[in-house]
Amino acid sequence: LETFLSNGPVVLGPLDMGHLTYNPNHTILYGVDHFVTVYALDGQYLYLHDPAGFACMKVAFNDILEAWKAEAIDYKRGAYSMWGNFKKVKSPSQTQIYQETARITRDRYLDGQSNVLEYYAKAVAENGLNTEQKQLHQYFSFKLAAVRNLYLSKFLKDHDPEGARLKEELATLFGQAHLSCLKEDYQELAHLLYQIAEVDGRFRDLYVN
């Protein structure tokens, strides 16, 4: 880590958010993967920026080791993963970036399971949410999905206006889903999840068909 830091910031991860104790919600985030940027190391302390809204954190090195083991993160390639020595290797145009994004989007839809959202909506309508699901959605997943769809909508505006419109619609629906989850109105939440599935299906058709 010290060697990497001599050449610039270092990305640490995946980390298990449940062990990041500077986050007041950490106790309900065990098993959620995360990444942070370390910009300095001073004796026994790391200085890092966390994109979850925690900038300039001073964290004891030993306090982050448990998160860094990532024992509950399925896709990890071992403990204590990090990336550093970053160098810019190419400067693609905005069109090239869009074309690569479109390719990745298509591949992920083709490789993914179908009708997952519909099945989940049906389960929510029939059974509501258990404690683990409720905590995940209230503190993490729906608000993150809203933000990510909004970012992608902005990116797509110059390349795919219809895709941008659908992504903005998805952002709005995920925002509403967050509120329904807070109210524990599971029939309303299920209805929104069905809507999300329908809009996502239309977005999928733009890239797969």
Where are the language model's segments positioned?
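Noncatalytic regulatory segments and standalone regulatory/sensor domains
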Residues: 29, 41-147, 151-158
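Long non-globular sequence segments
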Residues: 123-209
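Conserved active-site-adjacent core of cysteine acyl-enzyme catalytic domains
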Residues: 1-90, 162-166, 175-179, 187-191, ...
